[in-house]
Amino acid sequence: MFSNIGFPGLILILVAVLILFGPKKLPEIGKALGETLKEFKKSTKELTDDAFQEKEKKEKM
Protein backbone atom coordinates (compact mmCIF):
# COMPACT_ATOMS: atom_id res chain seq x y z
CA MET A 1 0.00 0.00 0.00
CA PHE A 2 2.67 2.50 1.03
CA SER A 3 5.58 0.78 -0.66
CA ASN A 4 5.77 3.22 -3.57
CA ILE A 5 5.56 6.54 -1.68
CA GLY A 6 9.31 7.10 -1.59
CA PHE A 7 11.38 9.64 0.28
CA PRO A 8 10.00 12.78 -1.45
CA GLY A 9 6.47 11.63 -0.68
CA LEU A 10 7.30 11.17 2.99
CA ILE A 11 8.81 14.65 3.16
CA LEU A 12 5.67 16.09 1.58
CA ILE A 13 3.46 14.27 4.10
CA LEU A 14 5.59 15.50 7.02
CA VAL A 15 5.39 19.09 5.78
CA ALA A 16 1.60 18.82 5.37
CA VAL A 17 1.23 17.43 8.91
CA LEU A 18 3.47 20.16 10.27
CA ILE A 19 1.37 22.84 8.56
CA LEU A 20 -1.93 21.31 9.70
CA PHE A 21 -1.09 20.65 13.34
CA GLY A 22 1.82 22.96 14.08
CA PRO A 23 5.14 22.16 15.69
CA LYS A 24 3.73 22.03 19.25
CA LYS A 25 1.27 19.21 18.51
CA LEU A 26 3.69 17.13 16.43
CA PRO A 27 5.34 15.28 19.37
CA GLU A 28 1.93 14.41 20.82
CA ILE A 29 0.74 13.07 17.48
CA GLY A 30 3.94 11.07 17.01
CA LYS A 31 3.64 9.56 20.48
CA ALA A 32 0.00 8.61 19.94
CA LEU A 33 0.82 7.07 16.56
CA GLY A 34 3.71 5.10 18.05
CA GLU A 35 1.54 3.76 20.88
CA THR A 36 -1.18 2.81 18.41
CA LEU A 37 1.27 0.90 16.21
CA LYS A 38 2.76 -0.83 19.26
CA GLU A 39 -0.68 -1.97 20.44
CA PHE A 40 -1.60 -3.13 16.94
CA LYS A 41 1.58 -5.22 16.65
CA LYS A 42 0.99 -6.68 20.12
CA SER A 43 -2.59 -7.65 19.26
CA THR A 44 -1.53 -9.16 15.94
CA LYS A 45 1.19 -11.22 17.64
CA GLU A 46 -1.24 -12.47 20.30
CA LEU A 47 -3.75 -13.44 17.64
CA THR A 48 -1.22 -15.38 15.58
CA ASP A 49 0.17 -17.06 18.72
CA ASP A 50 -3.33 -18.14 19.74
CA ALA A 51 -4.03 -19.51 16.27
CA PHE A 52 -0.73 -21.41 16.27
CA GLN A 53 -1.43 -22.92 19.70
CA GLU A 54 -4.92 -23.96 18.62
CA LYS A 55 -3.47 -25.63 15.52
CA GLU A 56 -0.94 -27.54 17.64
CA LYS A 57 -3.72 -28.73 19.98
CA LYS A 58 -5.71 -30.10 17.06
CA GLU A 59 -2.65 -31.89 15.64
CA LYS A 60 -1.96 -33.63 18.96
CA MET A 61 -5.48 -35.05 19.15
Swiss-Prot record:
GO biological process: protein transport by the Tat complex
Source species, domain of life: Bacteria
Subcellular location: Cell membrane
Lipid metabolism keyword on record: no
Record's GO cellular component terms: TAT protein transport complex
Transmembrane segments: 1-21
Membrane topology: Single-pass membrane protein
Gene Ontology molecular function, alphabetical: protein transmembrane transporter activity
Alphabetized UniProt keyword annotations: Cell membrane, Membrane, Protein transport, Translocation, Transmembrane, Transmembrane helix, Transport
InterPro entries (alphabetical): TatA/B/E (IPR003369), TatA/E (IPR006312)
Pfam families: TatA_B_E
Family according to the record: Belongs to the TatA/E family.
Role description: Part of the twin-arginine translocation (Tat) system that transports large folded proteins containing a characteristic twin-arginine motif in their signal peptide across membranes. TatA could form the protein-conducting channel of the Tat system.
Assembly and interaction partners: Forms a complex with TatC.
Name of the protein in its database record: Sec-independent protein translocase protein TatA
Organism of derivation: Bacillus cereus (strain ATCC 14579 / DSM 31 / CCUG 7414 / JCM 2152 / NBRC 15305 / NCIMB 9373 / NCTC 2599 / NRRL B-3711)
The organism's taxonomic lineage, starting at the top: Bacteria, Bacillati, Bacillota, Bacilli, Bacillales
